[in-house]
Amino acid sequence: MSISIESYGPLNSNYINRIQDTLNKSVNEYPRTMCLRIDLHLPTDNINNHNADSTLITRFIISLKAQVEADLQRKVCAGKRVHPCRIRHIWVREFNPDGKKHYHLVLLFNKDTYAYPGSYYCKEDGYMHNLSLMIMEAWVRTLNLHTQVNYQQHYSLVHFPGECYYHLNTNNQSFNTDYCTVMDRIIYLAKEHSKIGTDRQRNFGCSQY
């Protein structure tokens, strides 16, 4: 499988190996995998309260997993068929030219459980309860912003890039091509540029399973 990496500049080979290993574990467990790219930003005020980078992402994943488990339980109680979904993740910490931190993440789901993120826009009757909403809720709760009045204004701290999700199916004839397309997109997280290695905090992490 050839992977196009030229456009991202110097890449961290260890990050590449761990990204590929995490993706492989997902498709091995779930032959139909949905890969979702998101960006997480910090509020501009009280930014010093959010310096524990690895802990911050860990809390986000824990919150998201709890919401997914509750969502699946509601569906079971409603008599709907559900599929197991062990969420895997890959994250990197980066800095803008002005020094502001943000995080790029890849979230990997069982496509039989969540095939699409769903709309993340507010409709006239509010937000639809879908994967996007659970992700935005998880980040707001992680930052402890959910106690504020009108806390949904902070949902915009989660950014869903264009073409933010991809599907992989190991049984499709196009799997190798699709796999390379996904790797070409998410290997962006392995680029050396815009990361800081002098503050003794982690710039990269991924699921250990």
Describe the role of every protein-language-model region.
Residues 37-43, 106-111:
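Short loop/turn segments at strand-loop or loop-helix junctions that form parts
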Residues 40-86:
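Short N-terminal edge-element motif at the start of the domain
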Residues 2-5, 14-15, 33-35, 45-49, ...:
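Intrinsically disordered, low-complexity Ser/Thr/Pro/Gly-rich regulatory segments
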Residues 47-49, 73, 77, 100-101, ...:
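Short, solvent-exposed secondary-structure capping/transition elements
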Residues 23-27, 77-80, 88-97:
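Catalytic micro-motifs at enzyme active sites that drive phosphoryl/nucleotidyl and oxygen chemistry
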Residues 37, 70-88, 146-165:
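Short glycine-rich, low-complexity/disordered patches
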Residues 1-30, 112-209:
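Catalytic "initiation/cleavage/transfer" segments centered on a nucleophilic residue
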Residues 88-115:
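Histidine-centered divalent-metal-coordination microenvironment in nucleic-acid enzymes
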